[in-house]
């Protein structure tokens, strides 16, 4: 009986260590958001100015101040998660590694490496390469010319930034959902695709994507949410099972 109590206490302490990692990560996201809040206006201003559009023929406008505030807070949260994610995945790796076999350690490390390192890199590519390229491309395609004069164009800054926010949330939520589902299968919590945990994870993913997408994606929210869930579930089924 004493042995059982010791084992139970050991498991409790082990679980408490995992909860501590999650708690510190959440605190890190809050602190990073507070820090970035002092610079978010400058970051957005410099990013908009970095778009290689003809300065004489375009104007950025904000048609809804409240949407602009929501946009800034969404960006703060996305950037904060990207900053803290490497720390979180590193701590989780150190937490779980002692209880895994060598083959399991390799897969586990690669999965966390993808989530903790690749996501921030992809977010950088989206915001500083892909999105500016698309904005500049569609600006050139859609520019209206009248005689020798080019008609001045106005761009809604919130709508442009919201495009990147939507893609960022899809990437972050979809990748983390895939990771959680893969870990559930990896540790035997999901067998033959039958598990309440799997269904709950998919429902949470669907709800998060549906609620986090900006108004720019109205009309596509449900479709995008379903595709994200289906993609995450399909990729997680590739998880190797070591016996």
Task: Please state what every model-predicted region is.
Residues 1-243:
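Membrane topogenic/interface segments and analogous intrinsically disordered interaction regions
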């Amino acid at each position: 009986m004493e042995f059982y109590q010791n084992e139970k206490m050991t498991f409790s302490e082990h679980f408490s260590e995992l909860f501590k990692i999650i708690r510190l990560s959440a605190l890190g996201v809050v602190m990073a958001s507070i820090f970035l809040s002092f610079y978010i206006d400058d970051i957005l201003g410099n990013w908009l100015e970095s778009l290689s559009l003809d300065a004489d023929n375009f104007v950025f406008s904000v048609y809804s101040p409240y949407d602009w505030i929501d946009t800034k807070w969404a960006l703060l949260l996305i950037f904060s998660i990207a900053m803290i994610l490497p720390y979180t995945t590193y701590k989780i790796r150190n937490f779980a590694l002692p209880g895994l076999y060598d083959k399991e350690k390799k897969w586990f490390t690669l999965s966390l490496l993808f989530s903790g390192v690749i996501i921030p890199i992809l977010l950088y590519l989206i915001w500083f390469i892909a999105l500016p390229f698309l904005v500049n491309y569609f600006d050139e395609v859609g520019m209206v010319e009248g005689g020798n004069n080019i008609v001045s164009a106005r761009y809604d800054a919130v709508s442009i930034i919201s495009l990147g926010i939507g893609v960022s949330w899809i990437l972050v939520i979809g990748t983390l959902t895939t990771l959680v589902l893969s870990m559930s299968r990896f540790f035997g919590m999901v067998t033959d695709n039958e598990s309440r945990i799997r269904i709950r994870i998919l429902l949470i993913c669907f709800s998060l994507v549906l609620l986090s997408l900006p108004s720019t994606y109205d009309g596509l929210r449900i479709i995008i949410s379903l595709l994200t869930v289906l993609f995450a579930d399909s990729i997680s089924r590739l998880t190797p099972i070591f016996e």
